[in-house]
Amino acid sequence: MSKSAQRTFPVSWEELHRNAKALAWRLLDIGPFTGIVAVTRGGLVPAAIVARELEMRLVDTFCVATYDDRSIGAPTILKGIEGDGTGLLIIDDLVDTGVTARLVRSHLPKAHFATIYAKPAGRPLVDTFITEVSQDTWILFPWDVELQFAQPIARRRD
């Protein structure tokens, strides 16, 4: 995700599920696809929802490590996919700077690439997406956050 993100955009499980179903609706008339490739780890949950909605049983992963919770590094392929991507649907949660998408596209150039969220820098690299967010926004996915007690506003003034 963008190193310079200044805003946060929290996404609930319900919102993610709704947006993944919306993505499936958009993809329904684009296929048929022979299989889904989830870009790990962020693409796993959206790919499962899209696979269910499109009644697809063949799901694989393209495993890439590009960042952790503190920094962005050079992308490393941990597990790739054979072939040029013909007939495949690539699913990821987000395209941000395009580093991961560019790497995956270079290995599967004929696949259809879909994400739930897209930022301006990476948007040209995906074929289908649901929601555009600004480049300076950090998306808080439900698998990255947990609920905790928040102090009342009056107590936070100190």
What is the predicted function of each stretch?
Residues 1-158:
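PRPP-associated nucleotide enzymes
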